[in-house]
Amino acid sequence: MKILNLYSGIGGNRSLWGENHEVTAVEIDEKISKIYSYKFPKDKVIVGDAHQYLLENFNKFDFIWSSPPCQTHSRLNFANQLGGKYENRIKYPSMSLYEEIILLQQHHAKNKWVIENVIPYYTPLIQPSFSICRHYFWSSDFILSAQF
């Protein structure tokens, strides 16, 4: 299976996928991508913008995993903006999360995909497929194994 692992970090969930796949990982931080490459030497690692890479390459993969940055969606960040040390630094929630969900729902429906993010401080604009602990997941008609 050809897998696209976006915002890959040092690998996290990648260790659950086994070695029988052709994995392309995209990470913006070069230092972090080197750690990923060390842990998963068979994977192709791209240092770059995962959001843009998805837009340009989504149709080349059988399965896509995306875990976009959560900071602007998190309840902790929202609480800090209201009264914590970051007061008066309110930021818009990043809409890249919803851009990716819509892109994959409309243009990658025949293949498998999952987008993961924290449960936000607001009512989600698109209802998630399911939740686990503090995380929402939007997905194709794909069910994660209980091992996750």
Predicted regions and their residues:
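Conserved active-site and SAM-binding loop architecture
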Residues: M1-F148
